[in-house]
């Protein structure tokens, strides 16, 4: 199974997410790890557009996905995100279970290729992303990713549910 599954059916307002993410960037929380410092803004009452996107996802795909967290993630152009998996981190950043897979929506920046070990490079705008496979990226420009993090469901099961068309 490929490590990403591109999404073509949007449930988000890209312009609204971009504007909110840019405004919230100054409030990003910093999570230093051994390899890189993660910069993120989690979904709160100060992120109504992110909350709308999450609710739209839940309406479009009314399944039990378990715990999902949402955030904006910031990566500077040229910053090296070396080989890593998201479900094994050197730093506990929350009380939530580790991330099993994500939906990543690029709302700012170029569509730089993400490289997956043993799979090669993939370019995406929006995709279900298997974060349990070693991957890396060095973006050419600053990137902002809107991210839904699935804490209790594996990539294969999320893809299966997302591919099941409901409400179309």
What function would you assign to each model-found segment?
Residues 118-135, 140:
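Conserved metal-binding segment of the jelly-roll/cupin
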Residues 1-72, 80:
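Non-heme Fe(II)/2-oxoglutarate
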Residues 67-69, 78-80, 100-104, 111, ...:
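Extracellular structured ligand-interaction cores
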Residues 101-106, 126-128, 141-160:
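A short hydrophobic beta-strand segment most commonly corresponding to one strand
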Residues 100, 106-123:
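A short beta-strand-loop-beta hairpin characteristic of the jelly-roll/cupin
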Residues 82-86, 113-118, 138-139, 157-161:
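A short secondary-structure junction signal
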Residues 71-96:
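Conserved short histidine dyad/triad with adjacent acidic residue
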Residues 80, 88, 108-112, 127, ...:
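Short, solvent-exposed loop/turn segments at secondary-structure junctions
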């Amino acid at each position: 199974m490929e490590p990403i599954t591109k999404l073509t059916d949007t449930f988000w307002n890209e312009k609204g997410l971009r504007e909110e993410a840019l405004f919230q960037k100054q409030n990003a929380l910093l999570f230093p790890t051994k390899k890189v410092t993660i910069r993120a803004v989690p979904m709160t009452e100060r992120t109504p557009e992110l909350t709308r996107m999450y609710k739209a996802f839940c309406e479009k795909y009314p399944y039990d996905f378990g715990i999902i967290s949402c955030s904006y993630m910031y990566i500077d152009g040229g910053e090296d995100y070396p080989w890593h998996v998201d479900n094994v981190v050197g730093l506990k950043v929350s009380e939530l279970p580790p991330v099993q897979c994500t939906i990543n929506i690029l709302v700012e920046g170029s569509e730089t290729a993400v490289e997956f070990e043993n799979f090669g490079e993939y370019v995406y705008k929006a995709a279900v992303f298997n974060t349990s496979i070693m991957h890396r990226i060095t973006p050419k420009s600053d990137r902002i990713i809107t991210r839904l993090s699935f804490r209790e469901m594996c990539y294969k099961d999320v893809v299966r549910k997302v591919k099941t068309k409901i409400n179309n």
